[in-house]
Amino acid sequence: MSSIADRKTTGITFNIQKYSVHDGPGIRTVVFLKGCPLKCRWCSNPESQRKSVELAYNTGRCLTLAKCVRCVEICTAGAISRAEDDTISIDRALCNDCEQLCSGACPSNALITYGAHKTVDEVLRAVEQDSLFYARSGGGMTISGGEPFAQPAFTLALLREARRRRVHTAVETCGYASWDDMAAALPFLNYVLYDIKNLDDARHKEATGVSNQRIVENLRALRAEFPGIPVLVRTPVIPGFNDNEADIAAIAALTRELGVSYQLLPYHRLGTQKYHFLDREAPMGEVTLDAETMRRLEAVVAQTADS
């Protein structure tokens, strides 16, 4: 496809995060895309799960309808009404992927729009603002989500155009995608961050909603067909799911077999508030991960690597 066509390709992003140092080499800009085929109970970005633009509501910022009624008046779908405490109630069945006039009209930013339609050119203009940092640190752009391959055409166009502009590229993927979509994008990638959550298929399906077979198959295919691309496999350590020696040792053994790097990520609760903003329950509740468990599991990874 031509550069002109790629630059005009449109996708739905929900954040462009500057100066990230944890999502690939160097200083990076992370482009977060909407949509994910998994429904992980521990997901810290609930706003990433659905492909559509979504409206969130932070009641703590609301001026209440006693002082401001802009959102009620401007909503063309009739989705916003008065709640008993003079805040607002959002009918999610009526709220649709509109122009989000209500969040634009909200003077206190209590209404938040998660998601924006952007072209490849718009995204890369934001990414290229930090080109000096990339040059000095070996950084670049990382496409994350959600799941980048849930928007395969946009992801491919974004990677192709980034390559034309000599921007170092990386992708964060759960691996649950069409291999054809992944294989089309991989020639334009410099680095891959790949999630493996559990090798027990039944437990993986129970916790994420999908089988892990395609995920493991795609990782093996990636290593076989694109051996020159550095891969970092990452596992979020989740209390009650994979915070044990057997699960982590099994994944560590797979990464050793495939010759890829491996990293554990500690569970955190930073996304809990966003569930409430979207009128959803946070599935993990008040669960926490203790530091001693992480130290023990990191020792397991080190031992497996040395064996």
Curated annotation (Swiss-Prot):
The cofactors it requires, by name, are:
[4Fe-4S] cluster
Q: State any single GO MF term.
A: metal ion binding
Q: Name the Gene3D superfamilies for this protein.
A: Aldolase class I
Q: What is its EC number?
A: 1.97.1.-
Where does the Radical SAM core domain start and stop, copy by copy? 22-307
Q: Which residues bind [4Fe-4S] cluster 3?
A: C75, C95, C98, C102
Task: Name the domain of life.
Answer: Bacteria
Tagged with keyword Oxidoreductase: yes
Known catalysed reaction(s)? glycyl-[protein] + reduced [flavodoxin] + S-adenosyl-L-methionine = glycin-2-yl radical-[protein] + semiquinone [flavodoxin] + 5'-deoxyadenosine + L-methionine + H(+)
Q: How is the cofactor bound?
A: Binds 3 [4Fe-4S] clusters. One cluster is coordinated with 3 cysteines and an exchangeable S-adenosyl-L-methionine.
**InterPro entries to which the protein is assigned, alphabetical:** 4Fe4S_Fe-S-bd, Aldolase_TIM, BssD/PflA/YjjW, Organic_radical-activating, Organic_radical_activase, Radical_activat_CS, rSAM
Q: How does it assemble?
A: Monomer.
Q: Which family does it belong to?
A: Belongs to the organic radical-activating enzymes family.
Protein name per Swiss-Prot or TrEMBL: Isethionate sulfite-lyase activating enzyme
* Gene coding for it: iseH
